[in-house]
C-alpha cells in the first residue's frame, strides 16, 4: 500500500513538472544550436589569421563584442554581430514610446500595441544589422593587418558576408524570442549569458597555467578567487534588494456592508536598469581604443593614440568617464523602464493610495523621489562592480572574462532564471491544488 502511494505521488510529481522539463530541454537545445552556429564561418575569411590578429585588439570594444557572441567574432562566424543590434533597437523603440505620439498610443493599446511595438523592434534590428554588417565588411580591408585575412576581396565576398551577418543576427533574435516563449527566462539575456560562459573554462585554464608557470603567484590567484566570490555575493544581495512602498486601498461598500482590503506593497528594485548601463558605458570607454587600433597608424588619426593613452584603466580620465557613463545610463534607462506618473495614475484608478500622500501628482512626485535615490545608489553599486574587476584585470593580468560587466551579466541572468523557475513551480502547484479541490471560477 505504501509503495503504491509513493509511486502515485512520484508519478503525479513527474506529470506536474513535465512541462517545466520540456521548457528546460528547449532552452538547452536552443543553446546547443547557438553554440554550433558560432562555429559556422563566413565564406572567404581566413579564420586562423583573424583569430591571431584579434589577439592584438585586447582591451577594445571588439573584445567585448567577441565575449558577448561567445567567440563568434574571432572565428568570423555568421553570429559575429551577436545580439547587439537587437539590444540597440529595443532601446531606440523604448525612447520612441516616451517622445513619439504614435508609439505612446501603441504602448497604451495593451497586448495588441505590444505586438506592434515588437514588429518595429524587429524592423529596426534588421536595419541596424544591415548597416553594421555593411560597415564591418567594407572596413575589413582598410584595417591594418586584415588585408591577408580576406582570401578574395571581391564584390561577391562583400555580398555573401553582408547577407551572412544579417541572417545570423535575425536568427539569434528569432531564437531569443523562441526561448522566451517556449523556454524559461529572457531569451536574449540567456543567449548573451551563454556566450560569456562559453569562454570561462578556457580563461580559467589559462589562469591556472599562469600559476603553474610561475607568472601568477598562488596567493594572488587565491586572492582573486576570494574577490570574485565576495563581489558575486554583493551582486546577488543588491539585485535581490527592494524598497517596498506600502499601498492601501479605500474601503468599499457592497450592499449594507463595508469591506476594507488588505494592504499590499509596491516593490522598487535598487538596480532597476539591469546590466544595460554597464554594457553601454563599456562601449563608450572602449570605442576610442577600437578606432585607434584600426586607424591609429595614419597621420590624421594620431590624436586618437593620445586619447587612448589617457583612457587606460589606471588613468583618472578613464575612471571618471566610466563612472559618469554608468551613472548617466542608469538614470536614462531607469527613466525608460519605469514611469512614476503612470504608476501613480494606475494606483488612483484602482482606488489605491500611499498613506500620508495625496493620490495623483503628489504620489508621482513621492515615487519619483524614491526612484532617484534608489537609482543613484544603484549607479554607485554598478560603478564599483564594474571598476574593481577592471582595475584588477589591468594590474594582475586577470583574463577579460573576469571583468565587472561579464560578472554582472552572469549573476543577474542566473538570478532571473532561478526566480522564473520558482515562479513556474509555484504556479504549477497552485493549479494542481485547485484541480484537486475542484475549484471553479
Curated annotation (Swiss-Prot):
The keyword Ribonucleoprotein does not apply. Keywords: Cell membrane, Membrane, Protein transport, Translocation, Transmembrane, Transmembrane helix, Transport. The chain crosses the membrane at residues 25-45, 78-98, 126-146, 155-175, 184-204, 218-238, 275-295, 318-338, 376-396, 398-418. It is found in: Cell membrane. It is a multi-pass membrane protein. The keyword Ribosomal protein does not apply. GO terms for cellular component: plasma membrane. GO terms for biological process: intracellular protein transmembrane transport; protein targeting; protein transport by the Sec complex. Pfam families: SecY. InterPro entries: SecY (IPR026593), SecY/SEC61-alpha (IPR002208), SecY_CS (IPR030659), SecY_dom_sf (IPR023201). Coiled coil: none annotated. Component of the Sec protein translocase complex. Heterotrimer consisting of SecY, SecE and SecG subunits. The heterotrimers can form oligomers, although 1 heterotrimer is thought to be able to translocate proteins. Interacts with the ribosome. Interacts with SecDF, and other proteins may be involved. Interacts with SecA. HAMAP family: SecY. Belongs to the SecY/SEC61-alpha family. The central subunit of the protein translocation channel SecYEG. Consists of two halves formed by TMs 1-5 and 6-10. These two domains form a lateral gate at the front which open onto the bilayer between TMs 2 and 7, and are clamped together by SecE at the back. The channel is closed by both a pore ring composed of hydrophobic SecY resides and a short helix (helix 2A) on the extracellular side of the membrane which forms a plug. The plug probably moves laterally to allow the channel to open. The ring and the pore may move independently. This is Protein translocase subunit SecY. The gene is secY.
